[in-house]
Amino acid sequence: MINDSLIILAAGLSSRMKKSVSNNNLSKNSIEQANNTEKGLISIDKNGRPLIHYLLLNAKSAGFKTIYLVIGQKSKSFKNYFNKNIYDGLDIKFAIQYFDKNRVKPSGTADALYQTITQFPVLKSLNFCVCNSDNLYSSKALNSVRSTSFLNAFISYDRDYLNFSTEKVNSFSILKLNKNGYLEDILEKPTAKDYEFFKDKNGKIRVNMNLFKFNGSVFFEYLKNCPFDKLRNEKELPTAVLNLVKNQPNSVYGIPFEEHVPDLTSKNDI
């Protein structure tokens, strides 16, 4: 089955970015963008082009043709950007993540993906990929996850290649893969003792940077029935993935990758 659809998650409120304090002598303009602009639209080069620009170029180079951009129910910035910027060869569609008036924020990444599929039901019968809007994945990584023959898969990054501070790297959840490379578990906030038990067959610690491929007919029900995380009060994509793995072992393959992934989580990342 051809896989040329990429869903980009961009409906978060960027809370960590707005709350963070910069140690990098950012310009007044950069700080203003960080406090007021969706992360994917923050300028990252001298010409003012945002991260989403380069992510879309890499996606096109990787063979994607249809982009589903998931934005918040009040978001206007992305629509304004794409009214002024055309990406030939890419069909860009908008999905809206709505949330109940009793909530102060969206219901999480699993809910964002669920709402996207309900708004575009064709995705139920397709293979598609999913990624964050605030990570700049390489065209090589995007092509690898797009073209894999596994129904459900993700890029399994070698932690040693991520060029972040030790504090930031240690904050990433780590993955447990079986000897054949299939996902068995995801551990958030690991301790030093956990690392030894989560090494893969080559002795590597693997982390997930939210670059996935899913089969819609397989994964939709797990999104629909994803529970809220008790601490964060959100429906999180890794929870839905783990529920799939528990029900169907050897169903989600980790594609090993060794490279850095530029990331915009806090002001220090700009």
Please place each PLM-identified region on the residue numbering:
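Conserved core of the sugar-phosphate nucleotidyltransferase
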Residues: 138-221
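A structural signal for short hydrophobic beta-strand segments in well-ordered beta-sheet cores
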Residues: 41, 174-177, 254
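Conserved N-terminal catalytic core of the sugar/cofactor nucleotidyltransferase
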Residues: 1-5, 14-33, 45-127
